[in-house]
Design a protein with these regions (language model features):
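N-terminal secretory signal peptides that target proteins for export/translocation
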Residues: 1-6
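Intrinsically disordered, low-complexity proline-rich regions
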Residues: 7-9, 148
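Bacterial N-terminal signal peptides
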Residues: 9-22
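Scaffold/interface architecture of coatomer-like assemblies
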Residues: 26-315
């Protein structure tokens, strides 16, 4: 995959410059702030019926300050474009191999607006078996059994960063479904200070990429190490939560019996996403800003990244 320059695109109703890092930078930032954008998922607090959310129902806060919401568009119809990478750990055990039919079924059920890519985690890199394509049968054909060699992928977070950095920019939503044990053999685990995990989260946030993660045991000794698998699942939960995605399966006696219910949940989330644009507070320097996207619509909750990389306002 090759990342190109900084093309102008019309996105969410205004002209923006999409950089090679995925930052949305202001072309003519006014006194109201710096235009930025993100993908937000709506979910039901109770039950399965997700309420419809309108722009007037959305609030964006940076700290104690309220930001102006300039656009809120359902990711449907002409705005439904999605690029979805399925990123599989080549060091996974036999459990992942039993899930390939579920993954093929999921891929073949995707709408025409979704392009699916396949990649494998190997030695800290993402080996792309199929670039995102609208030919879902071609994407499904790229699935194969994992190598199943313990340590084949020493850090899933190196691989995630590698995928994110080499993923060409697009006006479509970009999201990842990664299946791995989450164990970072480069760092060793045992706390939440893993710098490679932090870097992967930062890379995904800068690119505006949402990550979904499901635990599947690795091959070899680590596949039945309780404390390693505990921390691996904590890491997966964190990368998903901080990027606005979801993590699946907390267990220590093997992987999930079937991926199907988790894939169905992810599909439901993809079907209830919105394209949000708002004016962030002008800053003198590029930097991270913590944000919170909320709504007061009954039985509705908005899920998004916890922070955004906001470019400095033009001087």
């Amino acid at each position: 995959m090759k990342i190109t320059g900084c093309p102008l695109k019309v996105l969410f109703g205004f002209a923006v410059c999409v950089s090679a890092t995925g930052i949305v930078c202001a072309q003519n930032a006014g006194t109201n702030g710096v235009p930025v954008h993100m993908v937000v998922t709506a979910e039901a607090r109770h039950g399965s019926d997700v309420p419809e959310i309108s722009q007037r129902d959305v609030m964006v806060n940076e700290g104690h300050d309220r930001d102006e919401v300039t656009s809120w568009i359902p990711a449907k119809g002409d705005n439904a474009a999605l690029e979805l990478f399925i990123l599989l750990d080549d060091g996974s055990g036999i459990n992942l191999g039993t899930q390939l039919d579920s993954l093929r079924k999921f891929i073949m059920a995707q709408p025409a607006s979704t392009k699916v890519g396949i990649a494998y985690m190997q030695n800290g890199t993402a080996k792309v078996a199929q670039s995102p394509t609208g030919d879902h049968a071609l994407a499904a054909k790229a699935l194969r059994l994992p190598m199943g060699a313990g340590g084949a992928n020493a850090s899933p977070y190196f691989a995630l960063s590698d995928l994110v950095k080499r993923w060409p920019e697009s006006a479509a939503r970009r999201e990842v479904f990664m299946a791995t044990d989450g164990i970072d053999l480069y760092y060793g685990g045992g706390d939440l200070q893993d710098p490679y995990l932090d870097a992967a989260i930062d890379d995904a946030l800068r690119a505006g990429i949402i990550v979904y993660a499901i635990y599947t045991p690795g091959a070899g000794h680590v596949g039945h190490s309780y404390w390693q698998n505990y921390w691996g699942q904590m890491y997966l939960s964190r990368v998903a939560d901080e990027t606005g995605g979801e993590s699946y399966y907390i267990g220590f006696t093997g992987g999930p019996v079937r991926f199907d219910p988790y894939l169905e949940d992810m599909e439901n989330r993809l079907d209830h996403q919105y394209l949000l644009a708002f004016n962030a507070k002008p800053q003198k320097k590029n930097g991270w800003q913590r944000i919170k996207v909320t709504t007061e619509v009954p039985n509705a909750e908005l899920v998004s990244a916890h922070r955004m990389w906001v470019p400095a306002a033009p001087q």
